[in-house]
Amino acid sequence: MKVLVVGGGGREHAIIRKLKESPRRPALYAAPGNGGIASDAVCVPIAATDVAGVVSFAVQEGIDYVVVAPDDPLVLGMVDALAEKGIPAFGPNKAAAILEGSKVFSKNLMKKYGIPTAAYETFADAGEAAAYVRANRKYPLVVKADGLALGKGVLICEDEAAALAAVKSIMEDRQFGASGSRIVIEEFLTGPEVSVLSFTDGKTVVPMVSSMDHKRALDGDRGLNTGGMGTIAPNPYYTPQIAQVCMETIFKPTVAAMNAEGRPFKGCLYFGLMLTPDGPKVIEYNLSLIHI
């Protein structure tokens, strides 16, 4: 059996290490991999976002299964492209990947189906967004780029000047490129933050161990958000009682909502949660095995 893991970071190395322990003893490949992965798998010089290149290699090499670990190739439709060639892959298809690929979509989905999240507004015009900020009197305020931004597209703004600067940076200066064509401006939630990865086949949701993700760049919960500075698990605030509430009010309803929208989600679904005084609320969804 031949298995290809798409990606080139520590997460992909961890996945390959576990696959290496399989009694099936698969031949392992990574695209593009890295120097460390090269000791455990054959690395091929194909970028994780090169959908055509990955598919071509998988066909030529006779790959039996592909694990698409990063979010970018999922949003680009790599799972769909592999399926067209009859190659099964782990991860959501392009239609489902919009759950992370567009924060506007995910926020509207939660609102439509009653999944608890922060109050918000969406904007496609920088002037309208700036006017909304000037009318706001409650800070901090959170400004989010609509599309993928390597975990850096969420800006917590302490005052009007910072919020206006965030709108300008994202929508006018295009700090995150096309991902900033639209933004979400939402209320700032308080409480312990919880990260929960889960496996789903589009019907059943099986959560993994909870974790606490440290996103800020500096000590003392200061600095800009990053893709992640570290994680501890399990999360001490995520009790069995809270886990049950999240399952019934967030996890199951999210999967059901995606089915209702004709976008069944299959793969790994990450729930970024805040345990607010009003109960657990969704901060964000992610597609990938980000805390492996």
Question: At which residue positions do the language-model features occur?
Answer:
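ATP-binding N-terminal substructure of ATP-dependent carboxylate-amine bond-forming enzymes
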Residues: M1-A95
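A conserved helix-loop-beta module that forms one wall/lid of the active-site cleft
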Residues: F90-G153
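Short, charged, surface-exposed secondary-structure boundary motifs
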Residues: A38-A41, V55, I98-V104, L218-G220
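Short acidic-hydrophobic, aromatic-tinged amphipathic segments that line or gate anion-handling sites
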Residues: V44-T49, E121-A124, C157
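Conserved small/polar residues in nucleotide/adenosyl-binding loops
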Residues: V66, I290-I292
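General beta-strand structural signal in soluble alpha/beta enzymes
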Residues: V5, A30-A31, V67-V68, A89-P92, ...
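Internal nucleotide-binding/catalytic subdomain
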Residues: V154-L289
